[in-house]
Design a protein with these regions (language model features):
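A cross-family phosphate/adenosyl-ligand binding-site feature
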Residues: 1-139, 147-216
Length: 216
């Protein structure tokens, strides 16, 4: 494995609804042989519990991540994950000298968007995203709020102008809308596309109507 491949992607999960998007993105990165640095906000842990019934604990993060992915705890793919607590401002991703390749915030709340856009850094997720921007590394913000206020739209524009990719959690139904997981994978796959990571999460449009659906 090259030194470039060993550089991790930071995955930040904020408190927005959309835990399955984060799970699919993490699984896609690990299946691609990538290393992952995981940051879960305090609000995200509440959302994860509400949406999945799984209590994500700092002290048992590997067990809980395996449960979210529906993998065995012993799965060696999990060895590529490093977990950082949301309040750890001494963590690797808080520094520009840390060799992260980039970051995806999935899903992103309006509050996270606001904090990142003004460099608030109220927790490690926001700090890591701000560092990613200042170091000119890829930052993908998968915003999952509706409707969007004028203030949030302005903040998203600021992030876009600073170099971030703004990726609304808007699935393409041509990928096969009869399956919720297919719609989840579509959004996660678009996030990985924005990072430049190869994956097989989504069926790509080929110009042939019905081809993606027929692939099921």
């Amino acid at each position: 494995m090259s030194s470039e491949q060993r550089r991790p992607w930071v995955v930040g999960i904020s408190g927005a609804s959309g835990t399955p998007y984060a799970v699919a993105a993490i699984g896609g990165l690990l299946d691609a042989g990538e290393d992952v640095d995981l940051v879960v906000s305090r609000a995200a842990r509440l959302t994860i519990l509400d949406e999945t019934g799984i209590s994500f604990r700092d002290s048992h993060w590997r067990d809980d991540l395996a449960a979210l992915l529906d993998w065995k705890v012993s799965d060696t793919r999990l060895d590529a994950v490093r977990y950082w607590t949301a309040g750890d401002f001494a963590a690797g991703p808080s520094s520009g000298s840390y060799p992260a390749r980039g970051m995806v915030v999935i899903p992103a709340t309006a509050a996270a968007v606001a904090g990142i856009s003004i460099g608030l850094s109220k927790d490690l997720l926001q700090r890591a995203a701000s560092v990613t921007l200042k170091e000119r590394r890829p930052l993908v913000v998968v915003v999952r709020e509706a409707p969007l206020s004028s203030g949030t739209l302005e903040q998203l524009l600021m992030l876009s102008q600073a170099g971030a990719v703004i990726l609304p959690a808007s699935p393409g139904f041509y990928a096969g809308g009869q399956s919720v997981q297919r719609l989840v994978d579509f959004v996660a796959g678009k996030a990985l596309d924005a990072l430049g990571v190869p994956h097989s999460l989504l069926h790509r449009w080929s110009g042939q109507l019905g081809e993606a659906r027929d692939a099921d």
